[in-house]
Amino acid sequence: RLVVFLQGCNFRCLYCANPDTIDAKGESKETAPEEILKMAVSQKPFFGKKGGITFSGGEPTFQARALVPLFRMLKEAGIHICVDTNGGIWNEDVKELLSLADLVLLDVKEFNDERHKALTARSNAQTLKTAAWLEENQKPFWLRYVLVQKYSYFKEDIEALGEHFKNYRMIERVEILPYHTLGVHKYEAMKLDYQLKDVKLNTQVQLDEAKELFEKYFKTVYVN
């Protein structure tokens, strides 16, 4: 797949692997929609049946208004569109953007709102509303959950999440994303303090236990 990383994010996740994309006025270069379309079309022969273009970031919906025309052009070109989003931004542009997408990767950082705020500095209320909109509008999506010890690895929260989403028909799969520190060098380069330096990586036992928890509520669960 062709992956486009976009500048700007509304969340402040403590484990963010791309801190350089948070600031809307970051150092990324401005790219014309036509240029991205050209790249996608040129790579289309290599996409096969499962390929396409994925928009990540940062937070893609942060630039929803500018992306809508590009999404329309990509649809006309027959290119599969995937959006990786935290679901925390909502307006008419975001609504149209997600309507045009073929698949949404919805990152639910934590189900407990207070713990979500501790992890991201934002509420998860809109994320849950976005999930409900995807379900109501029959938009396929993957639910993704980063497993962070002391922050998002609580049995009661995962069970509450499962109870909330267990009857959603549009969730094609659940992905458990192990916590990693691959972006720490970026914090060092940007002279920023990485606040989770004392948090340990997940053990295989923890990942297996989390997978079993999610499988109580969802048919298809992967650890990625």
What do these predicted ranges mean?
Residues P140, V205-N224:
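C-terminal accessory region of radical SAM enzymes
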Residues E163-K166, E172, E188-L213:
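A structural motif corresponding to the C-terminal lobe/cap of the Radical SAM core domain
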Residues D20-G26, K117-S123, K191-V199:
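Short glycine-enriched, charge-decorated loop/helix-capping segments at active-site entrances
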Residues P19-I53:
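Conserved alpha-helical substructure of the radical SAM core
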